[in-house]
A protein has these predicted regions:
Chain B
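N-terminal membrane-targeting segments
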Residues: 1-43
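Solvent-exposed, non-transmembrane regions of membrane-associated and secreted proteins
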Residues: 27-203
Length: 426, 203
C-alpha cells in the first residue's frame, strides 16, 4: 500500500514537473523587433551603431544593446560620410491578450535633434540639418582596383615588357589616382531634419513606414544633390517626405553619365603622367591601354548609371515572411558595379533600419491562466455617494433647506423693517 | 498507522455519508423543488422571451427609474450608472424573463438624499418589484432583504452573482453603512419572479 502511494506520488510529481517545464522549454519568442540607426560599409567593411533587439516569449521583454550609439560621431568615429548628428534606435516586444506585438524605430537627426520615446510615432525630433555627403570620401583604403579585375589586361601584358618591375609602382599610382578620381569626389547631399523608419508587427501582419523630415522649408520634398568635380552639381531628385515603399532615386542620373566618364579619363591621365614620366615612351602605351581599359571596364558599369554607380532606395521594404518586415529609411549603394571586384558595393550606407515580427501567440495554457476569471464575477458593489454629484457632502438637503430658510427669513425681516420705516416717516 | 485505525476511519466516513444521504433525502421531501418554485403564479404568465430591462418600478418605495446596462470593472467592482437616479443592470446577468440565473440590478444610495435606492433597506418580504422590458413587465415578489458587510458580500459573490442558478431570481443591491466618510456594507434584496401579469387579471 505504502509503496504504491510512493510510486503514485513520484509519478504525479514527475507529471507535474513535466507540465511545468514543457512550456519553458518550448518557449519561443512571440514578438521580436530590432533597430539600427546607421550602417556604413566601405568595400564590404562595415561599421555602425549596433543593433538594439527586443524579444518576448510571454514571460517578459528581453532587450540587448540598449543605449548604444547616442551620436553618429560616437558610433562611426571619423567617418567622412556623416557628420555630427543624433542617432536613435529602439525596439520593443510585448504581449497583449496573449498575442505578441512588436515595434521598432531608428534613424538620424541633425545636431540638436532629440530622441523621443518609441511608440507608434517617430522616434526622432528634427534638429539642425543632417547633411549626407560623400564629397570627401576617401577611397585610398579600398580595394576597388585589383589586379585581377580592372587591371587584368595590363597584368597579362606587363611581364613581357621591360617595365615589368615597375608594376608595383604603377599599381600604387593607379590606386592613388583612383583615390583622387571623380569617383572620390562625387558628392551626394541632402539636408534632412530627420531620417527615420519604423515598423510594427502583430500576429499575421507587419507594417513599416519611413519619414524624411526636411529643413528646406518645403514640407513635401527634400532635394538630393549630386556634385561633380569642378563644382558642378545636379539635383538628382526631390524626394517626398513620406516616400512610398521602395522609392528609387533615379531622376536625372543618366544626364551625368558622360560627365563622369570624361572626368575619369582626365583624372587618370593627369595622375599617371607624373608617375610614369621616367618610363618614357613605353609607358605611354601602357598608360593609354591602362586608361582605356580602365574606362572600358568602368563605362559599361556606368550605363545605366542609376543601376551601376549610385543606387538609392528610400523606404526600402522587404517581407522575409508575410508577418514580418524590414525597413530601411534610406539605402544607398555607391558603385554597385564594384560587386564583381570587391564583393560588395563600394559604399553601402543604410540609415534607419528596423525589423519587426514575426509574431505569435502565447501558448493557450498561459492564456487560460490569465487573470480573467476573477474580473468576470463582481466581488464588490460600489453604489454609494456621499452627496449628489456636484454637491459637497455635508451640504445635503437639510442644510440647504436651512440656508434657504435663513435667507428667506432675513429677506422677510428686511422687508418688514423697510415697511415699518416707510410708515414711521409718512 | 495500523490497519485497525484505517478500518475505524473508513467506518466513520461511511457512517457520515449515510447520515448525509438521509438528511438530503428528508430535505428533498420537505423542501419545494425548483420546478414547483418556478411554476407560474396565478394571475401571471411566463414571459414570452427574456428581454433587456429598461425601467425599475418599486411601488412600495416609489421608485420609478430607468435601467442602463453596466459592466464589471477589471477590479471586479460593479458600479451603477454615474447618475444616482438611474439603475444599472449587470449585462452579464440574466435578462428578465429568463428561467435560470440571476438578474442583478444596482443603484446608488446618496447619503444626502436623491439616490434611486436610498430606501432599498425598507423593502419588506412580499412587496412587489416590477422590471419593465420591451417584451413585457416582469413582476417579482421580495423574498429576502439583508445587509452584508463589504467583505461578506465578496465572500458570497458566487451565490449573489453567478449565473448557474437553476431558477431565476432578481437581485437588487445598493450601499449602506455610511460612516461619514464611506459606505461599509451593502443592502441586498432578493425577489422571486411571478411572471408577466395576465391581461385578464390586469384588466
Amino acid at each position: 500500500m505504502r509503496s504504491s502511494l510512493r510510486f503514485a506520488s513520484i509519478v504525479g510529481a514527475f507529471a507535474l514537473s513535466t507540465v511545468a517545464i514543457t512550456p519553458a522549454m518550448a518557449a519561443a519568442p512571440v514578438s521580436q523587433a530590432g533597430a539600427n540607426a546607421v550602417y556604413l560599409a566601405v568595400a564590404g567593411n562595415g561599421q555602425g551603431t549596433g543593433t538594439v533587439t527586443a524579444t518576448n516569449d510571454g514571460s517578459g521583454e528581453k532587450k540587448n544593446n540598449v543605449g548604444t550609439a547616442p551620436t553618429v560621431v560616437g558610433a562611426l568615429g571619423n567617418n567622412p560620410v556623416l557628420k555630427a548628428g543624433v542617432a536613435a534606435q529602439d525596439a520593443t516586444a510585448g504581449v497583449a491578450d496573449g498575442a505578441g506585438n512588436s515595434a521598432a524605430c531608428a534613424g538620424l537627426a541633425g545636431e540638436d535633434g532629440s530622441v523621443v520615446k518609441i511608440g507608434s510615432g517617430n522616434c526622432l525630433k528634427p534638429g539642425k540639418a543632417l547633411t549626407l555627403s560623400l564629397a570627401n570620401l576617401d577611397l585610398s583604403n579600398t580595394t576597388l582596383i585589383q589586379p585581377g579585375t580592372a587591371l587584368d589586361p595590363l597584368t597579362s601584358q606587363l611581364p613581357a615588357l621591360p617595365v615589368g618591375q615597375t608594376l608595383g609602382t604603377v599599381t600604387a599610382a593607379i590606386e592613388d589616382a583612383i583615390a583622387g578620381t571623380p569617383l572620390g569626389e562625387i558628392g551626394l547631399s541632402g539636408n534632412f531634419g530627420a531620417l527615420q523608419a519604423r515598423c510594427t508587427a502583430s500576429p499575421g501582419t507587419a507594417q513599416g513606414t519611413a519619414n524624411l523630415a526636411n529643413t528646406s522649408g518645403d514640407d513635401q520634398h527634400t532635394p538630393i544633390t549630386l556634385s561633380l568635380p569642378g563644382g558642378t552639381s545636379v539635383i538628382l531628385a526631390k524626394i517626398p517626405v513620406n516616400p512610398a515603399p521602395n522609392t528609387k532615386v533615379v531622376t536625372g542620373l543618366d544626364t551625368v553619365t558622360q560627365d563622369i566618364v570624361n572626368a575619369l579619363k582626365t583624372q587618370f591621365n593627369d595622375a599617371l603622367d607624373g608617375v610614369a614620366a621616367p618610363l618614357d615612351t613605353v609607358v605611354d602605351a601602357i598608360q593609354d591601354q591602362l586608361v582605356t581599359n580602365l574606362v572600358a571596364q568602368l563605362q559599361p558599369a556606368l550605363q545605366p548609371l542609376e543601376q551601376q554607380v549610385l543606387d538609392i532606395t528610400l523606404n526600402k521594404q522587404t517581407h522575409p515572411t508575410p508577418d514580418s518586415i524590414k525597413v530601411n529609411a534610406l539605402d544607398l549603394q555607391l558603385l554597385p558595379a564594384a560587386q564583381a571586384a570587391v564583393g560588395s558595393s563600394l559604399v553601402n550606407l543604410q540609415i534607419g533600419n528596423v525589423a519587426c515580427g514575426p509574431s505569435g501567440r502565447v501558448a493557450s495554457s498561459a492564456a487560460v491562466a490569465a487573470p480573467e476569471a476573477p474580473a468576470a464575477l463582481p466581488t464588490s458593489v460600489s453604489a454609494g455617494y456621499a452627496a449628489m454629484p456636484g454637491q459637497h457632502a455635508g451640504q445635503g438637503d437639510d442644510s440647504s433647506n436651512a440656508i434657504v430658510l435663513g435667507a428667506f427669513a432675513l429677506l422677510m425681516a428686511g422687508a418688514a423693517g423697510f415697511i415699518s420705516f416707510r410708515r414711521l416717516h409718512r | 498507522m495500523n490497519e485497525s485505525v484505517w478500518d475505524a476511519r473508513i467506518a466513520t466516513w461511511m457512517s457520515s455519508l449515510l447520515v448525509l444521504c438521509g438528511v438530503l433525502a428528508v430535505a428533498g421531501l420537505v423542501l419545494p423543488s425548483p420546478a414547483v418554485e418556478a411554476a407560474p403564479t396565478p394571475g401571471y404568465q411566463a414571459m414570452a422571451a427574456p428581454a433587456k430591462p429598461v425601467r425599475l418600478v418599486v411601488p412600495a418605495l416609489k421608485i420609478r427609474a430607468p435601467i442602463l446596462p453596466i459592466e464589471v470593472t477589471p477590479q471586479a467592482v460593479l458600479d451603477p450608472p454615474r447618475n444616482p437616479r438611474d439603475v444599472g443592470w449587470w449585462q452579464r446577468s440574466a435578462r428578465p424573463g429568463a428561467t435560470k440565473g440571476q438578474t442583478v440590478l444596482t443603484g446608488h444610495t446618496v447619503h444626502t438624499g436623491g439616490g434611486v435606492m436610498d430606501r432599498l433597506g425598507k423593502l419588506r418580504k412580499g412587496q412587489l418589484v416590477r422590471v419593465v422590458t420591451p417584451k413585457g413587465t416582469m413582476t417579482y415578489s421580495t423574498t429576502r432583504v439583508v445587509t452584508w458587510s463589504k467583505a461578506e458580500l465578496a465572500r458570497r459573490a458566487v451565490s449573489i452573482f453567478a449565473q448557474t442558478r437553476p431558477t431565476n431570481r432578481l437581485v437588487l443591491i445598493t450601499c449602506s453603512g455610511w460612516t461619514g466618510k464611506d459606505y461599509t456594507s451593502n443592502v441586498v434584496v432578493f425577489a422571486k419572479p411571478l411572471g408577466v401579469r395576465e391581461k385578464t387579471a390586469a384588466a
